[in-house]
Regions:
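A short, amphipathic alpha-helical segment
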Residues: 460, 547-558
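Phosphate- and divalent-cation-binding pockets in alpha/beta enzyme and binding domains
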Residues: 261, 265, 524-528, 552
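Intrinsically disordered or compositionally simple regulatory linkers and C-terminal tails
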Residues: 468-480, 553-571
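Short secondary-structure transition/capping segments
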Residues: 126, 527-536, 561-571
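Transmembrane helical cores of multi-pass ion-transport proteins
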Residues: 1-421, 435, 497, 501, ...
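The feature marks cytosolic C-terminal regulatory regions of anion transporters and related permeases
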Residues: 355-532, 536-537, 547
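Peripheral, non-AAA+ core regions of ATP-driven protein-machinery
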Residues: 540-541
Length: 571
């Protein structure tokens, strides 16, 4: 029941954000919600209209038609169908892992940027300014228009909007405490949490009553047709489908990442797991249902799913109860929307997206890995300045470049034996035993095109000047390097460029009477090497373990060297 009450104002608000009539938001809560409940492996996830998807719809469809028009709605149903088909194709091809391209910094920067854009877009209705902005306008364009029309603010609308913001904040902050100190409604924290999120329902009811009772001169939703949605067949326009496809892919990926993350988080609280493949199917089918019922793309809702969980829902039946409330609203309560003020709906949207934004993680990332901070702010700035789709692509591009940059300069550690144990550690970090005729190098990366040249150069340099070992060999009887042992415990694959690099390195060192050996090879990599007859070109041997290699290559080596390193170092 609580979820259904929260869904109604959010559905109407997000529909207007997407550039659609209010009923389209309610339609997005019927067929999609029921279909997802029947197919999903998550017990608490509630799908329907969400702010991020609404913004992406406005950005995409606004390029092809005027908001709130029949043509706009028709294009939106095509977009919903494409999103659904893409998700089901990902399930059929079992390539759902493609969503991993959207790393946490990309998603965080995208959500934070989108939240700022959405909040800026709601400042006009919040203040009663009737601007001429398009739904696909960016943040900068909207700010310029707000400044241009600042003299047209409506004090009454501002009072309603700001009052709604304050009331929702108060309910969120003190509502649970009031329940706890008063009568024990349900008695536990989950119920208090759910009641703390009923602010949107309260401000919607009060705002509508105040406007209707006092006849206030503010922008309102107006007439909303009653009745259930009719079957809608998407437009069959090949050029339109082609134009929408790139953005449909992005919306599908963002919708799935958002939905799956919420579902996984809620399932973990019950020590359960959800099936990512099943979630692809369920969300895809839900979006197809949205298309056929005149709605726009749907995704998992964080706020409604949280309320659903906090209310004690443990089966998908709760989503069906929510759908019943939407049906009742469409059949008998739509006249009430006539006096629902835009300022109140803007406040509902602002509070919802404010809860999604998370800038605190940036501080943590700065201390841990600053490349993630760069990705976050590049995505954030891209969304603000270039649009949501461009910002997302910028973030993905930078994260891939940073990954390639890191793997192109892999960490290589020269290791030695830790005392008389079968364990080996970095000579720069531990007190270990080494032999000057043997260089044992652990490469902490796979061998592929991006790092092949770097690896060849650095491994050859280690033979000339082994790290942490005497350059002149005086402490080891003047022995020259005779063996290069490549420890491949961190190598997960070798591509053809990496293979050619190993062959070149082997032949290059053979001319200097240095044998190349491999050890700690993983099964898949060993299979790869067997296909290219490694025994025919490798000048050394392939050992099972590093200990085996050291025992064999040092048994007649003579004097070893202690590497004295401070004990407080770390591997």
């Amino acid at each position: 029941m609580a979820v259904g009450m929260l869904t109604v104002p959010q559905a109407v608000a997000y529909a207007l954000l997407a550039g659609l009539p209010a009923q389209a938001g309610l339609y997005a809560c019927l067929a999609p919600m029921v279909i997802h409940a029947l197919l999903s492996s998550s017990r608490q996830l509630i799908v329907g209209p969400v702010a991020i998807a609404a913004l992406m719809v406005a950005s995409t469809v606004g390029q092809h038609a005027a908001a709130y028009s029949d043509a706009y709605l028709g294009i939106t149903t095509v977009l919903s169908l494409q999103v659904g088909v893409i998700l089901i194709l990902l399930r059929a091809l079992q390539v759902g892992g493609i969503v991993n391209l959207l790393s946490h910094p990309v998603i965080s920067g995208f959500v934070n940027g989108a939240a700022v854009v959405i909040i800026i877009s709601q400042l006009a209705p919040l203040t009663g300014i009737a601007t001429t902005s398009r739904v696909d306008d960016g943040a900068v364009d909207r700010i310029v228009l707000l400044v241009r029309f600042v003299t047209e603010v409506n004090p009454t609308a501002i009072a309603l909007g700001v009052g709604s913001l304050l009331l929702m904040a108060a309910v969120r902050r003190w509502g649970p405490a009031l329940v706890r100190s008063g009568a024990k409604v349900g008695g536990d924290g989950d119920v208090r949490h759910a009641l703390g999120r009923t602010g949107p329902v309260l401000v919607t009811v009060l705002g509508t009553a105040v406007v209707a009772g006092f006849g206030l001169d503010v922008g309102v939703v107006g007439s909303v047709p009653a009745g259930l949605p009719e079957l809608t067949l998407p437009l069959l326009d090949a050029q339109l489908w082609w134009d929408l496809a790139p953005n449909a892919v992005l919306i599908a990926l963002v919708a799935f990442v958002e939905s799956y993350s919420i579902g996984k988080t809620l399932a973990a609280r019950q020590r359960r797991r959800i099936d990512s493949h099943q979630e692809l199917l369920a969300l895809g089918a839900a979006n197809i249902g949205a298309s056929l019922s005149g709605a726009y793309p749907v995704a998992g809702s964080f706020s409604r799913s949280s309320v659903n969980y906090a209310s004690g829902a443990r089966t998908p039946a709760s989503a069906l109860v929510c759908a019943v409330i939407i049906v009742l609203t469409l059949l008998w309560l739509t006249p009430l929307f006539a006096n629902l003020p835009h300022a109140v709906l803007a406040a509902v949207v602002i509070v919802a997206v404010y809860e999604l934004a998370d800038f605190r993680s940036v501080v943590r990332d700065w201390r841990f890995y600053r490349g993630d901070v760069l990705t976050h702010f590049a995505t954030f700035a891209g969304v603000l300045l270039a649009g949501v789709e461009a910002g997302l692509l910028i973030g993905v591009g930078i994260s891939v470049v940073l990954f390639m940059r890191g793997s192109a300069r892999p960490h290589i550690a020269v290791v030695g034996r830790l005392g008389d144990t079968p364990h080996f550690r970095n000579v720069k970090r531990y007190e270990v035993r080494t032999w000057s005729h043997l260089v044992a190098a652990r490469v902490d990366e796979s061998f592929y095109f991006a790092n092949a040249d770097t690896l060849e150069s650095r491994l050859a340099e280690l033979v000339d000047n082994p790290e942490g070992m005497p350059e002149d060999g005086d402490s080891a009887g003047g022995q020259a390097v005779e063996h290069l042992l490549i420890i491949m415990s961190a190598v997960n694959f070798i591509d053809t460029t990496g293979l050619e690099m190993l062959q070149r390195l082997t032949h290059r060192l053979a001319r200097r009477d240095v044998a190349v050996h491999f050890c700690e090879i993983k099964g898949p990599v060993r299979d790869q090497l067997e296909h290219v007859a490694v025994d025919e070109w490798l000048t050394g041997r392939v050992f099972q373990t590093t200990d085996d290699a050291f025992n064999t290559l040092t048994e007649a080596a003579g004097k070893w060297i202690w590497r004295d390193v401070p004990a407080n170092t770390r591997d």
